[in-house]
Amino acid sequence: MELYYLTAHELSDLLNRKEISSEEATAAIIDRIEAVDGRVQAYLTRTAEQALEEARAVDAARARGETLGPLAGVPMALKDNLCTEGVRTTCSSRMLADWVPPYDATVVRRLKEAGAVMLGKLNMDEFAMGSSTENSSFFPTRNPWDLERVPGGSSGGAVAAVAAGEAYFALGSDTGGSIRQPASFCGVVGMKPTYGRVSRYGLVAFASSLDQIGPITRDVTDCALVLEAIAGHDPLDSTSADLPVPDYRSALKPEVKGLKIGVPREYFGAGMEPEVAAIVRRAIAKLEELGAVCEETSLPHTEYALPAYYLVAPAEASSNLARYDGVSYGLRVPGKDIIEMYMNTRSQGFGPEVKRRIMLGTYALSSGYYDAYYLKALKVRTLIRRDFETAFEKYDLLATPTSPTVAFRLGEKAGDPLAMYLSDLCTIPINMAGLPALSLPCGFSQGLPVGLQLIGRPFAEATLLQAAYAFEQSTEYHRRRPELGVA
């Protein structure tokens, strides 16, 4: 297999045995980016020279016999809503097209401490609002498995980069499925940790009660490795949980015997492509074959998750995005007075989907409609959380499709926001409940990847990783790579 298609842990083993240098691995990835990113369009900002300098520094430290971090010398990339000191961070928006943060996000700092090498910043839907990466203000990213299809979103650039061999791993953010849905579309592993497991400090906020940062990797072992590096309490984020970080790699045993897995029938309803449903059911049967006990169950309020989410998330976005006014930082479009300057800046700085959600959120929070919409959505959110609590009294995990479909064609849903929102039908309830969930490849339909979603109890990421690892070790889907020849 080509060097750029190795997993992070495979590369790390080669580096530790000194069979290859970090500079060589980084140069190979930079060459790969040069060869294919003109078609995939995953990167917004490349930091090739900085990456090579960081790689040389790791090689020098290794030569001196210094103790190195678990990701030392491994090249990675970041979704462009994670603050990076001295490196442009745009959120794929005109509003922040030239913004350079003065500090690193906590997860970025932790990756640096672990020794990882940063290749650049990755395309996304503007302010993480979208399911296809077509809402980027710069350009759409393409799915490496079929360049006429979307990679999913909003972390489409991050997932496409990992799938295409343009980074060994990436970090994304997940507010309603933005790591898991594109991971399903592009055939990689994507995890949304429990809300509070990973610090949000330095993540440009979309919906603060739903956002969570997580790893995007080529296999489950890499997922465990990266999660362990970024997880843990952070005094700079009051919502981060003050709990010890487990040794996630020690949970990676190919053993699910006796594990009880619930299969919610509501996740196989209308809108589900029959072949996707069949592939996911075969994956669940494989877990059963490996010794898990799988039973059908019910999460009765699932059908209300999507409408409730599209009140809660836009309401929080309306508040969070009020800060972009042209005064302190970011885009400023002049006007005859400050009111006109605000209007010009926000109308020209935000794209159509962001404006749509700000309008919806502002409406839901307005005095005449707050009780009827926003407050009711919060009550529904409580019912959704209670459904999961009831299910987890009986089951260790839940298993569902990650997405009701395979990757759709570029432009296919761009003019139909409701059709686009339905892409996250299977992922949104997990964010509403604050639970951990993971998508991993479980098959192919029409030559396109399909994802299995595993959902766990709060802070039970180790159990998720164990079950995912057991499935992965008994199949070969995670070893398949898209055939992206060099143009």
Curated annotation (Swiss-Prot):
Source organism superkingdom: Bacteria
Keyword flag Translocase: no
Class of this enzyme: ligase
Record's catalysed reaction(s): L-glutamyl-tRNA(Gln) + L-glutamine + ATP + H2O = L-glutaminyl-tRNA(Gln) + L-glutamate + ADP + phosphate + H(+)
GO cellular component: a single term: glutamyl-tRNA(Gln) amidotransferase complex
Quaternary structure (record): Heterotrimer of A, B and C subunits.
Full protein name: Glutamyl-tRNA(Gln) amidotransferase subunit A
Lineage: Bacteria, Bacillati, Bacillota, Clostridia, Moorellales
